[in-house]
Structure formats: structure tokens, C-alpha cells
Amino acid sequence: MLSHEMASTAHRQPSRPTTRQRQRTGRACEECRRRKLRCDGQQPRCGVCVDSGVTCEVNSQRRPRGPKKGYLTALRNRVAMLETRLPAQHLVGPLSEFNPLSTPLTNDHHDGCSVSSASSRSDSNPPPTVSEPDMSLPNTTTSVSSAPSFATCSKDIGGAEPITELVQAELNQLYFDRVHPSIQILHQRRYLGWARNAAKKTSRRCLQYAVWTLASLLSAQFQHLQDSFYQETKRTLEFSYLSGDSNAPVDTEEIQAWILIATYESMRTFHRSAWMSAGRAFRLVQLMRLHEIDSPTKPPVPEADLVETEEKRRVFWMAYFLDHLLSMRNNWPITLNEHVICTRLPAPDMEFQSGQPVLGAFLSEAIMDVMPQTTSPFNECVILATICGRSLFHAQQYSVRFVYGELAPNWTDQHQWLDNVLTNRLQILSQYYPSPTQICDPMLSFAHIMGQASVIHLYKGMASVVWAVDDGAWVVEYQRRALSAAQEIVKLAKGLTEFNFFKVHPLMPIPLLLCAEFLYSNRGSDAAFNSLLQELLQIFRQLKNANDPSRSYIHLLELSCTTASMSLVREHSNAP
């Protein structure tokens, strides 16, 4: 009896070969599908159904299995990638010596860039072009299935070398050590939590690569990777926009990536690209309505979402700050208007990182506060940028109203009010914050220099509408105050020479160049201006350029996009 059962079992289950064969063609029975077992296809009943004692049924009307989840989306993205790359591939030859990211359009005179400055850029430190080996374009005969996807780039950037987990960890740590103290828009624990996961949505991958881009720029060990990181981040940000759903919600990580890329491009003196990238961030901020996070019409934020909400506040205010700095530098209209903002100022970074964010004040409250409840150098920078933005807006508005023949409010009264507010903020900086010489804090140093640069910017606004000022003696007096502010900037800048270049705020060139241009423009009115200018230029020779540590801030003057800076460079180079 036992031998008969063994023989029967052996007949039902023939011996399998030692090597694994491909799965049998044909349909599995319903019982095997339900139990997720491999069906042997025996008729009239398969082995599993015989052992289970159930009826063996095969559904011949079942629809064939379709592609895996996400396959079609990935395929569409790859097709879009190839379609975008193919036109550029035919231009690799003629464009091998031209980089649109760094070379300005010489026909545009609004930003003061000239042909001579363009030629100096191409000779000084040209950024990588699309024809570099590590970022080579695919062959036109490459199939869609072989196109590189962004999901695999974390393991291999540009085919140069694999990005191991150890390198990723070091780049993340470099970012939080050298970049985050100046650009405090990421919650470290939250970022590292999802950064370790292999499966990420596109916006988070873009942010991760933007983090690595800035980290590698400020690293001697990984600096050779920065161009590949940068190109991959920009390309994927563009692809996610072109191939995605135009009505899909925007992620905070996408805005963070654009802000970091704009900062990187500013540090590399890719001025036009920095402006365009910053503009993307500003529009996405408006699209997400981050200017009304704390609107009374919105429900209270759940406790579980406090960190995420605080991170959104920081993203908004960093975009706001960047918008005002670029507008100050180029005399542009402000994009993010302070008068429609209903988002509280960010909490101090220590409380934010600990997961216990303090509820900040509204901008309109903080700007008039004489005794701040919490101290935050970044908030001081935001307030100072707001004062400069108001001065810029008043000057632009006054000029337009004068052209239209409209009655404009008294310029002197408006300027006096801004000057009183600025004087109050400078007193708060000196009383409630340590001196930059006592502590090595890039944000604190930037806040102190930004405060003095604001005095210069207010004088610059006054000089632009000097015909509207009632009392000429007041203009002379404010010019003297601006000169005193420039003296303080020179003293603070001298302290920066004692720090490593990665301890200096990435946007520090903006207020320093503003000071240099002010001294240069007024050098004929008093010998003190020229003397101070020469001292500042000497400090520029000692300050290392993050774009190229072998060069100094003098090189940034050469790559500047304003007429005053380029005139200063020409005169300085022709001097005996």
C-alpha cells in the first residue's frame, strides 16, 4: 500500500532538473493563483489541487498581465529625456567652447554686462560644457530602455565613479556643516530620514542632488563631482516639469532644490542662470501659497505637522530674502510683496532642529519691535532686506509717479521713517547679538554687514531721486553716514580674512560689492572714499573665492554684472 502511494506521488510530481528552468507557458489555475504557488499545469487536475482536494479551474478569459506599476510613467520620462537631448547632441561640436550658464547675453544692457566681461568669463574659469565626458549625451541610436534614469544616478554619476553610501553620508554631513549655517531651510533629521531610502519621489532626489552640489563645491575632496551633480539636478528639475502633470501639487522639496541651485549658481557667478532659478523658486512659492501659512482662515496646524510647517516657513523666508537681495543688487522690482504676507517669521534654528519650533512674530510686528523676544540672525537679515526693499520700492514708485504727473507722497518723510526703523535694527544688532569677531557664525557676520550695507542702500535710493529731496544738506549728511557704514563694513570684512572660505556666507559678495561700488561712485567727492576703497580692495585680494579658492574676491569684481563694478575693475587694472 505504501509503495503504491509513493509510486502515485512520483507519477504526479516528476523529478525536477537540478538547474532552474523558465516558468511553463500557459495559464495557472485559480487555486494556484489564490495561493500564489507555481502551477504544474497537469490535466485534469494539477498537483496542488490534487493535494488540496479542490476542483482545478483555469480561467481562459483572464486579461493578459499589463506593465508593472510606474513603468509607463518612467517610459514617458525617458522618452522626454531623449527628445530633449537629441537636438542638443547635434550642437555639441559648435558649443564645446560656449556655456550658456555662465556667459551673459552681451546685447542686454540692463545689468551692465558687456562683451569684454563675457570674454573675461570665458578665459577665467569656464564651467563645464555639455560635451564633457562625465556628462556625455546619449547616442541617437540608443534605445529607450537603455536611457539612463535618475533613479540609477545615485549609484553612478555621469559614468565616472559610483557614489557609495559612505560618500553620500559624507556629502550630507558636509552640507550641514558648511552650507546649512548660512541657508537654514532643511530639518536635518527629517532630511536624513528619507535620504537613506532608495525609493524617493523626483522632487526629493532633486533636493538630494542639490545638497550634494553645494557640499561638493565647498569640499576639496569631492569638488570634482560638483559639475555632474549640478547638471543632473538642473536636468531632472526641468524634466519633472516638462513630463509631469501641470496640475500636480508642488512639493516643498522642489522649491528647496531651486533655492539651493540658485545659490550655487550665484556662487559660481552664473548670474543669469541664478536669476532664472531663483525666479522658479519665487513662482513655486506663490503657487504653494506659502505667503499665507499662518492665515487666520486656515485651520490650526496639527502637532505632528509642526516641523513640516516650520520648514515651509523657512523656505518662504529664504526665497523672500533671496528675492530682495537680487532686487537690491540689480535695481529690480520686488517679486514677493511684503504687504500680502501672512506667514510668521521662522523660529531659531536650534529650536527648529530639536523639533520644538517657537512660534515667531509676523514681519510687521517684528520690524517695529524694540526688544525682540527671540534672537535670530536670519530674521534680522529678513528685516534688513525688507527695509532695503521698501527704499527701493519708494524710489521706483516716486520716479514713475513723477513721469505720470501724479502727486507723490513726500519723499523725505518716507525716507526719514525708514531711517528710524533701520537705526533701531542696528541698535538691536549691537545690543542683543554678539560681535562677529567673538563667534564664527556666517549668518551673524552677514547680518552685521547687511545692516551697514542697508545704510548705503538707503543713501543710494536717496541719490536716485535727489531732485525730490527738499533739503540738500540732508543728502550730504546721509552721505557722511553711508561713508561711516562703509568704514564699518571694511572693518568687518577684514575679520572675514581670518576664516576659511566655507565659513563665509555664500551671498556675502552682494553687500561687499555694493559697498565697493558706493565708494567707487563717490571717490571724487572726498579723498576718504578713495582711501577706503583701496583698503577694501586689499581685503578683497585676501578673501578666497568659493568658486575657485585659488582666486580672490577681485575675480568676482571681474565677473560682476553691474557697470560700476566693471568700471572699477578696468580702472584698477590700468592703475600703475
Curated annotation (Swiss-Prot):
DNA-binding region, residue intervals: 29-56
Keyword flag ATP-binding: no
Gene Ontology BP term (one): DNA-templated transcription
Protein location: Nucleus
Region (Disordered): 1-27, 102-148
GO molecular function annotations of the record: DNA binding; DNA-binding transcription factor activity, RNA polymerase II-specific; zinc ion binding
Annotated keywords: DNA-binding, Metal-binding, Nucleus, Transcription, Transcription regulation, Zinc
Chief location bin: nucleus
Phenotype upon gene inactivation: Leads to a large decrease in the transcription of pksCT and ctnC, together with reduction of citrinin production to barely detectable level.
Keyword Zinc: yes
Family annotation (PROSITE patterns): ZN2_CY6_FUNGAL_1, ZN2_CY6_FUNGAL_2
Name of one Pfam family that matches: Zn_clus
Compositional bias segments (type: Polar residues): 137-148
Compositionally skewed regions (Low complexity) per UniProt: 114-124
GO cellular component labels: nucleus
Protein role: Transcription factor that regulates the expression of the gene cluster that mediates the biosynthesis of the mycotoxin citrinin, a hepato-nephrotoxic compound to humans due to inhibition of respiration complex III.
The protein's name: Citrinin biosynthesis transcriptional activator ctnR
Species of origin: Monascus purpureus (Red mold)
